[in-house]
Amino acid sequence: MFDCVLPTRNGRNANAFTRKGPLRLRNAACRHDQSVIEPGCLCVACRPSTGHQEGGFSRSYLRHLFMAQEMLGPILVSLHNIHHFQSLMLDIREAIKEDSWSLLYERWPVLERKRGCQNEPA
């Protein structure tokens, strides 16, 4: 992956990247959300670990970490964001190799939404 502070800077500020678009973990909507940042993601923040069969750290717990100014929150979200961009770059390389851009847009709905001159909110 290229050298960029985007994943960690956003992670430190409670912004997580997902295939469907950005997720702001400080928002009140995450207060009671028991889902992980991105279901199916295999990063350390999202994947099931020993004792947590249903998944990794919930959005509500991550929000709590940020609100309490605990360092674990920024660390976990930064690791998730780095994993997110590594997965994106891997899929882009595969799409180039296989000339299958439509498959890339299926896997990454956020890219489809941004394509063209659409007047949709980001």
In which residue ranges do the predicted regions lie?
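Alpha/beta catalytic cores of nucleotide-metabolism and tRNA/nucleoside-modifying enzymes
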Residues: 1-122
